[in-house]
Amino acid sequence: MGASIQNKLSICIACYGDDLTALFEAIEKGKENLPSNWTLEIIAGDQHPEPAAKANVWETQFSLLYLHHPNGLGRGNNRNTIARASTGDYLLFLDADALPVDPEQFLTNYCSALINADVVVGGTAYKSGSSSLRHTIGRRKEVIPAHIRTRKPHANFSAFNFAIARSVFLKHSFDESLKDYGHEDTLFGQELRYACKTVTHIENTAYHLDDDSDAEFLDKTDGAIDNLVWLIREGKIDEEVKLFAVYRKLQRTGAVHLMKVLRILLARGIRALLIGGLRSVLLYDLYKLLRMSGHAIKIGRRNF
């Protein structure tokens, strides 16, 4: 009998001054059940001006490579830099505020799926108890079973918790022109679709532990909308993006002019209501459309 094929999984974590101890401990639990023909490495890329106080402890305790970029690289560039530093056959990208729901089986589930897939998305979960706007919106929009995500596999791609063959990623990496928060995974999923890469969705969720205040979350939402507008102008996004599709309908019917007026009249009030404790997904979606209507949007042409 021939020797079994050896595979290596590189866990890639982009962070900004986050305490990654709980995530590393969860990964350690998963290592115990890792198939015998798989090995593991962990790489963290930190863009905070100051190195993590626990960096030396992490490197010793969890045998990880800690990359510090005090001048910042941007979200896409940071992930790409981590990937280039990796030595694995496959990459597992986890956000810094992710925590596997089932740590004992988390890595094994990915290893099994990657044998027959180039890109695998595990899914998002939220712990019960929090009533923050971020968690309310997340539970309604991001907690989607794998069989539902599979219906539109590329549109439902999320960079929060996914694995990919390293060879595929190096050909189709994150767009480094996006420096700030928002829609980098939307663009990445679309690029995979254009490249005819199959995206496989499985039930292998991680909790999203984001603890942003309501105001911080809306600030991030504003930034994400601004990023989306820039992508539209550059011709990098098509109408499979739901918010863009809705906006295009408003443009075609002329209703976008009404939205511009409503933005002046309502946007600040809606923001105050959302920060003040009102938990309405419909109102949040309206807030995003109003933010978008504040831009002069000329649809760019994609250059293939």
Segment roles from a protein language model:
Residues M1-K29, N37:
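N-proximal low-complexity "stem/linker" segments adjacent to membrane-targeting elements
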Residues A55, H69-S86:
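Glycine-rich, basic loop-to-helix element that forms the pyrophosphate-binding segment
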Residues L99-R134:
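Conserved donor NDP-sugar-binding/catalytic core segment of glycosyltransferases
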Residues P145-I164, D180:
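A recurrent flexible, glycine/aromatic-enriched loop bordering the glycosyltransferase active site
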Residues G223, E240-F304:
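Non-catalytic, C-terminal membrane-associated alpha-helical segments of glycosyltransferases
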Residues I27-H68:
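Acidic donor-binding segment of Leloir-type glycosyltransferases
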Residues L91:
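Short aromatic/hydrophobic "clamp" motif used to bind/position activated sugar donors
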Residues D180-F188:
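Acidic donor-binding loop at a coil-to-helix junction in glycosyltransferase catalytic cores
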